[in-house]
């Protein structure tokens, strides 16, 4: 995948791949040492597969954010791609982006909008069409560049004829451009292969980090060869703040390093990151404009080694072993949002939306076959009970 060079030659970047013990380093050349970031940065815009869209190497992830001022600041910094969703809080993110774009005049023509909704088997054609129209209204626009079927867990979630018929109708009317999927499932490899074979999906918007999914790069290469573009998110591999702070010595930034790492993959077009204040816009713009250093590579290796038996890869092995049907992956994700992403209210809301039989209350008195099932040696039952305590503000 070619990228349009503006300042930094990324041919000297090292290619990193996930292995069982941490991060493996390969590729050619010598890593550049970290540079001091200035207040303005220039970075690349990469083609998003065969869509014809050019996306900024970092994109604005607006998860749960109602800040049109930040969105305008990101545009001023050169970020042209915004990832929002119609799923949360009555489309709050879409409304905020719509407000931000309403002040741009002709500049709004440069904005690439990525949004979507949960679309599942059994959903009606009219519901799909209504959801697309609702997103258009909230965004104050007449066209969505990429429309995602969100939070796809397995290939079965792609067997929705109404999705493809509804998308085709909306595309014929000029309302949407390209169909994609978003996912952070543990079964990423079979899902993405199924999506490639599906023939309808043009864009992947997926979790990608240096600890999980050792076979993911081969799948992304296959997708790229067929013209499917890839955007990624959650590059921080759990975002465990205490461990990160211990590693950030000598002015290193762990979040910046993970973005730089993801951009070493030529099959990744853009990294979506949560930009919650003006400083994060500056930090992530700087990350896209500067190479990955040898010190940053060492930091990522140390983190991967330390987190080997503590970071949930959402592989699903433990959940499959649970005799009580506990939603292990969802609960672990909500606990991560609560403890490490500053999204406490959302985490609690989503946990309490689970069916009662799927909550971690069911872990009381269980012998914990999930512990033995985890291929990474995590103490799954204890972590689920702790998650329940956090998300309920009371003991299980």
Predicted regions and their residues:
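Conserved, mostly hydrophobic/aromatic
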Residues: 48, 60, 82, 97, ...
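Alpha-helix-loop-beta-strand connector modules within alpha/beta enzyme cores
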Residues: 98-114, 169, 173
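N-terminal secretory signal peptides and thylakoid transit peptides that target proteins
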Residues: 2-21
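Hydrophobic faces of well-ordered beta-strands that scaffold small-molecule active sites
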Residues: 56-60, 82-84, 113-115, 147, ...
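Structured C-terminal cap/extension of enzyme domains
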Residues: 48, 200, 218, 222-396
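C-terminal segment of N-terminal export signals and the immediately downstream linker at the start
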Residues: 27-58, 76
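Glycine-rich, proline-tolerant flexible connector loops at the mouths of alpha/beta enzymes
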Residues: 83-102, 152-155
């Amino acid at each position: 995948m070619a990228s349009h060079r503006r300042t930094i030659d990324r041919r000297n970047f090292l290619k990193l791949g996930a292995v069982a013990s941490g991060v493996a380093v390969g590729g050619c050349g010598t890593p550049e040492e970290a540079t001091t970031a200035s207040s303005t940065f220039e970075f690349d815009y990469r083609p998003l597969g065969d869509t014809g869209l050019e996306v900024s190497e970092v994109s604005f992830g607006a998860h749960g954010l109602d800040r049109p001022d930040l969105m305008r600041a990101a545009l001023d910094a050169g970020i042209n791609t915004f990832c929002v969703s119609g799923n949360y809080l009555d489309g709050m993110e879409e409304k905020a982006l719509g407000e931000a774009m309403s002040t741009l005049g002709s500049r709004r023509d440069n904005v690439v909008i990525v949004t979507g909704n949960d679309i599942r088997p059994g959903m009606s054609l009219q519901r799909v069409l209504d959801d697309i129209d609702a997103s258009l209204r909230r965004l104050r626009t007449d066209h969505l560049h990429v429309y995602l079927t969100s939070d796809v867990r397995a290939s079965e979630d792609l067997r929705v004829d109404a999705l493809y018929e509804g998308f085709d109708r909306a595309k014929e009317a000029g309302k949407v451009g390209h169909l994609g999927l978003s996912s952070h499932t543990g079964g990423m490899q079979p899902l993405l292969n199924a999506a490639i074979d599906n023939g309808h999906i043009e864009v992947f918007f997926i979790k990608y980090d240096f600890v999980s999914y050792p076979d993911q790069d081969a799948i992304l290469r296959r997708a790229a060869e067929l013209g499917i573009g890839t955007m990624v998110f959650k590059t921080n591999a759990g975002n465990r703040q205490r461990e990160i702070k211990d590693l950030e010595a000598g002015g290193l930034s762990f979040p910046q390093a993970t973005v730089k790492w993801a951009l070493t993959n030529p099959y990744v077009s853009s990294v979506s990151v949560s930009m919650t204040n003006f400083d994060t816009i500056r930090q992530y713009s700087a990350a896209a404009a500067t190479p990955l250093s040898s010190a940053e590579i060492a930091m990522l290796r140390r983190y991967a080694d330390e987190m080997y038996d503590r970071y949930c890869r959402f592989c699903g092995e433990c959940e499959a072993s649970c005799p009580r049907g506990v939603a292990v992956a969802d609960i672990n994700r909500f606990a991560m949002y609560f403890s490490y992403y500053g999204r406490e209210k959302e985490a609690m809301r989503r946990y309490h939306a689970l069916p009662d039989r799927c909550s971690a209350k069911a872990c009381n008195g269980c012998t914990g076959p999930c512990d033995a099932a985890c291929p990474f040696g995590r103490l799954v039952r204890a972590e689920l009970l702790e998650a329940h305590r956090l998300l309920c503000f009371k003991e299980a």
